[in-house]
Amino acid sequence: MNKIIKLIILSLVLILFTGGCTFANSKDTGNTDNQNQPNTDDPNDKDSKVTFQAEVIEAGDSLLVTPEKGSNELKSSDKISVGITELILKDQNGEDITLQDLKPGDILKITYDGTILESYPAQIKSSAIEVVGHNNLIDGYLAMIDDIWNEDSGLNSEIEMIAVDTTGWINLTDIEKDIILTSMKKAYDYKIITGTFDELADQGIIDKEHLYFENGVHIVLSDLTYDEKTETITFSVSKWRSGRGAIGSNNSKAEYKDGKWSITKGAQWIS
């Protein structure tokens, strides 16, 4: 009888020992499998894809953008140079386009692997870019400036620069202001500087005593309001060369309709 009891106890011990080993082996195998699985949340994973929206600063042979407000990319840098690797580039209609087709102010959806090189501008490599919109307000400012630029072209004769007072500009980031100034440089092929009348006089650029800007004209946009819903800007504007050479208008309006900006002048003046 005692032998039978001993055999039963021995059998139970062996069963428990064998089960414990099996559980331990199973647990180790599970950990090994988890360690070998890739972390799909890792932005450095070559197969991962990250997208963000950005606005075009410059485009052509290369692409420079500024990330949208609140994006992780903006935390890295306010300017990003986008490298091209077998790029897929589409317009808003899904048609293939080239970098040369992009314009300053275009809003892009950019796909990349999540890697941002720390430099200034920061650098990424993109595999796909899609145009999803455009900043029409930038074009609105350019339209207002171009309208006054073409008024009384005699004031523009024999100049070397265009000075712009940007202190009254609204609804624009500093980079968007730079986009406008860069676009002016390309459009008019003159040196573009910024400053108020007094700032330019303090720098000796404007002769304050004789009220004369020998080498340029001074353009001022002021009294600006913007209705984003109707895409309408109200403004006053002036172009100044001297005390006896200036033009402008007050309470003018710029409206975006049918894909373009139109200017309606308010009360005009000349001196």
Question: For each predicted feature, which ranges?
Answer:
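Short, charged beta-turn/beta-strand-edge "cap" motif at the junction between a beta-strand
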Residues: D113-S119
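Sec-dependent N-terminal signal peptides of Gram-positive bacterial secreted proteins and lipoproteins
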Residues: M1-T29
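General beta-strand recognition
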Residues: S62-L64, T234, S262
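Short, solvent-exposed loop/turn positions at domain surfaces
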Residues: N93-D96
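Flexible low-complexity loop/turn motifs enriched in small/helix-breaking residues
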Residues: T22, K27-D33, P38-D42, Q53-E58, ...
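Short beta-strand edge/turn micro-motifs at domain boundaries
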Residues: S249-S271
